[in-house]
């Protein structure tokens, strides 16, 4: 039995930090575990310009606790809209701080109202991204109300993603937080210009977790949890050693009152034990030897960034996740609140 894991410090390639006091509450959880994180731009006022991305980055860095200063690098993204210009993409690329552009279909998830209503309106901008090798990060769900919510990812592949890649074959794309066997098979079958992130919660939970023992709002996220066959396909992909599947938590904190309400928000907070969760998942699959590559190598390799040189260690030691944590003056219920985790940072 392995009692200690020491490996290259990982990165989180999909993270929601929020802003202000809320960000100050959750940022240390990520910065203690990860060297870098790809910061999502869907604030209440979306990050749509390079100038806004630079200002947000400065706020993140200033919010780091003193003991973590210099140990964490936020990687910034822009929020793609119908009116994002090719010139803005050029500015973003030249800035050196914007690493990617995020596509949210309008209405697909939290703070996505300003997202893209028709991908054809972005043709010139996407062409510039292809030319400059600026990656596109995709929330892969259609928002057609006629499509069943459990099929939105599968339909997105056929309706949006395949035509997009045919039109822009040189565009680098990350299929974010995949949740289905179809998404796994698509990434495996396509060129090396497309990769996918996989969350801890989609690896651990299937859609039964939404309803077992009553409605469970803290397990509600978008894309929603899927059938067990899809969870198993995700675990197989994450632990396969395939270099185009890598870690992205999609950790998305919301106040307790916004989760336990008549119209609850989508999002699961996992940053408090993210790498520990992944270690559990890989251990259960008998693939602890492949955790380092998934968490620390494949992401930077795909983005053309250097791998981290420092290390972290996890000990085989059980600890209990608190039932609630402070969140910018509110309370937050973390993933697996009150439960034991068998690895400890």
Curated annotation (Swiss-Prot):
Keyword Protein biosynthesis: no
GO cellular component, one term: cytosol
Pathway it works in: Pyrimidine metabolism; UMP biosynthesis via de novo pathway; (S)-dihydroorotate from bicarbonate: step 3/3
Disulfide bonds: none
Binding-site residues, substrate: 16-18, 42, 139, 222, 254, 266
UniProt xrefs under SUPFAM superfamilies: Metallo-dependent hydrolases
E.C. number(s) listed in UniProt: 3.5.2.3
Binding site for Zn(2+) 2: 102, 139, 177
Record field: catalytic activity: (S)-dihydroorotate + H2O = N-carbamoyl-L-aspartate + H(+)
Residues modified to N6-carboxylysine: 102
Active site per the UniProt annotation: 250
Residues annotated for Zn(2+) 1 binding in this entry: 14, 16, 102, 250
Key words of the record: Hydrolase, Metal-binding, Pyrimidine biosynthesis, Zinc
GO terms, molecular function: dihydroorotase activity; zinc ion binding
BP GO annotations: 'de novo' pyrimidine nucleobase biosynthetic process; 'de novo' UMP biosynthetic process
Keyword Metal-binding: yes
Cofactor note: Binds 2 Zn(2+) ions per subunit.
Cofactor: Zn(2+)
Xref: HAMAP family: PyrC_classII (MF_00219)
NCBIfam families named among the record's database cross-references: pyrC_dimer
Subunit description: Homodimer.
Similarity comment: family membership: Belongs to the metallo-dependent hydrolases superfamily. DHOase family. Class II DHOase subfamily.
Function summary: Catalyzes the reversible cyclization of carbamoyl aspartate to dihydroorotate.
The protein's name: Dihydroorotase
Organism: Nitrosomonas eutropha (strain DSM 101675 / C91 / Nm57)
Taxonomy of the source species: Bacteria, Pseudomonadati, Pseudomonadota, Betaproteobacteria, Nitrosomonadales
């Amino acid at each position: 039995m392995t009692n200690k894991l020491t490996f290259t410090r990982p990165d989180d390639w999909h993270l929601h930090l929020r802003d202000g006091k809320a960000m100050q509450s959750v940022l240390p959880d990520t910065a203690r575990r990860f060297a870098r994180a790809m910061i999502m731009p869907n604030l209440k006022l979306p990050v749509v310009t390079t100038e806004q991305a630079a200002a947000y980055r400065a706020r993140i860095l200033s919010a780091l606790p003193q003991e973590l200063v210099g140990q964490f690098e936020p990687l910034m993204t822009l929020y793609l809209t119908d009116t994002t210009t090719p010139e803005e993409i050029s500015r973003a690329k030249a800035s050196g701080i914007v690493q990617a552009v995020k596509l949210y279909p309008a209405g697909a998830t939290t703070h996505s109202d300003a997202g893209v209503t028709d991908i054809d309106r972005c043709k010139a901008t996407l062409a510039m991204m292809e030319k400059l090798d600026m990656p596109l990060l995709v929330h892969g769900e259609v928002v057609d109300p006629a499509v069943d919510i459990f099929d939105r990812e599968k339909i997105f592949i056929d309706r949006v993603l395949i035509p997009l890649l045919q039109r822009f074959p040189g565009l680098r794309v990350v299929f974010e937080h995949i949740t289905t066997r179809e998404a796994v098979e698509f990434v495996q079958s396509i060129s090396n210009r497309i990769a996918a992130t996989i969350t801890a919660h989609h690896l651990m939970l299937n859609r039964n977790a939404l309803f077992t023992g009553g409605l469970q709002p803290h397990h509600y996220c978008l894309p929603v949890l899927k059938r067990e066959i899809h969870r198993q396909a995700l675990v197989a992909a994450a632990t396969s050693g395939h270099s185009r599947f890598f870690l992205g938590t999609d950790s998305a904190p919301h106040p307790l009152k916004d989760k336990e309400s008549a119209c609850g928000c989508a999002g699961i907070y996992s940053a408090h034990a993210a790498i520990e969760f992944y270690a559990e998942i890989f251990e259960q699959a008998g693939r602890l030897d492949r955790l380092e590559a998934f968490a620390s190598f494949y992401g930077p390799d795909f983005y053309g960034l250097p791998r981290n040189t420092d290390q972290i260690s996890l000990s085989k030691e059980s600890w209990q996740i608190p039932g609630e944590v402070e969140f910018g003056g509110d309370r937050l219920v973390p993933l697996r609140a009150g439960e034991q985790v068998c690895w400890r940072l």
